[in-house]
């Protein structure tokens, strides 16, 4: 499994906000045989993460204009990082055993990866994906992408995160409908 925001994946002392996902503890506790390759983001003071993890250009009222370099990031994942992991670790490199996941901007990148490279990634977990970045471009990608059969996506948002944001709830519902209509095996939840 490939994961974005690697600093948040394993240990609390490395996590951006002091609380990690605890993936290593979970895998140990459940005795799950899974290799997790988690890459840290560029979490600099100038919001480089937004550039690194957005496949699209976008404008933000608070932070300004961003030239998304997410396509470059994902190309590196697919054409350099994954081959390195496959060559140096005992992986099963086929799409049936290759997953990708992340949250927020990493969730957006995970969704983008599944749509652009469903021949590489068979499953994705897009947790609280930043769909607001470029909803029109993402919707267009959902409509035109070539999907391998058996593509699986888990996508969710937190109920407190959504709160009273009717636009967020509506956008999530619309995106889920479009994804489901393409035949992706989708599990979508507000938790």
Language model: regions and residue ranges:
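Non-catalytic cap/lid and distal C-terminal segments of serine-dependent acyl enzymes
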Residues: 1-191
